[in-house]
Amino acid sequence: MNARPITDADIEAVAAMAAEDEAALQGRPSRLGANDVRDWLARVDLAQDSWLYEEDGTLVAMSWFDFIDDLGFFAGIVAQGAKGRGLGSRIVATGDARARERGAARVQTFGLEQDTAAASLFERHGFAFVRRFFAMAIELEAPPVVPALPDAFTLETFRLEDARPYYEALDAAFQDHWEHHTVGFEQWWEAKQAVHDFDPTLWFLIRDGDEIAAVIRNDPDRNGGGYVGAIGVQRAWRGKGLGRALLLRTFAEFYSRGVPRVTLGVDAESPTGATKLYESVGMTTENAGVVYEKALA
């Protein structure tokens, strides 16, 4: 069996394999596409930390590894027709070894909640459940009404000159988020501009005077529709309806572009009550994913 790094030319095939696997697990068609795979691999050094497994020229599995601070993370997919042949164990062993090489104190991986075979595999290799995340979505049937804000607040579209204060507001809002890692403005901004379909006309913010109180960052095409990549309200401004206003502004923008479907991912145990907010604007849970962790120190 041949293993080699993933290249841009492989993205469509990997997306098709991932969609087939997800559909089999959740019992309905998957909306995963090439842009979702590009997001998974956005921070990955493909030459060093990605693996595409082929047998007689046929794609049978893929995996990748990422590292930040003291944390290693890997994930992978085995094609439906190649399960039960040890590829999952090979992916886990490769991710574990790569994390140790990088000096990680711990390593995490991820699987859909329905994937009991993956859960058993991870547990056999010393991983334990640590967190659950929900994938939520809304299918808009009419343009949403964006609520008026109190006089002190203004809702605006992002401008390039807003980049640094926008980042600072987002980073501050995410201090409550599980496993948040501050990467610094330059690294964050470079990464965002490098996204192949970077579209800051889909980013919005709310000001309170000269201060940015809340922000939302959206991507045009993920999981079969528009995607909320991040939304954050700084602590001092929570409970004022700012998150709701940003979501409805986002929905209205996507609807005006002919995109009625919008999705996002959320920590099921978010201390800010994010799940309730998303439900209040009409979003429902489509599936759940589970993060597993293993200590290496």
Features from the language model and the residues they span:
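N-terminal charged segments
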Residues: R4-A75, D96
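Short amphipathic alpha-helix that is part of the acyltransferase structural core
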Residues: M1-D39, A148-H181
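Active-site/acyl-donor-binding loops of N-acyltransferases
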Residues: R124-P144, L248, R257-A297
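Conserved acetyl-CoA-binding loop-helix of GNAT-fold acetyltransferases
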Residues: G84-A97, A230-V233, G239-S256, T275-S280
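Acyl-donor-binding surface of acyltransferase catalytic domains
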Residues: D66-F73, V78-A152, V290-K294
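A short, internal acetyl-CoA/4′-phosphopantetheine-binding micro-motif in the GNAT/acyltransferase core
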Residues: L52, A75-R85, I231-R238, A268
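Active-site proximal loops enriched in glycine and acidic residues that flank catalytic Cys/His/Asp
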Residues: D208, I216-R222, A230-R235, F251, ...
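A conserved beta-strand-loop-helix scaffold within acyl/acetyltransferase catalytic domains
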Residues: Q26-D49, S63-D70, H177-V233
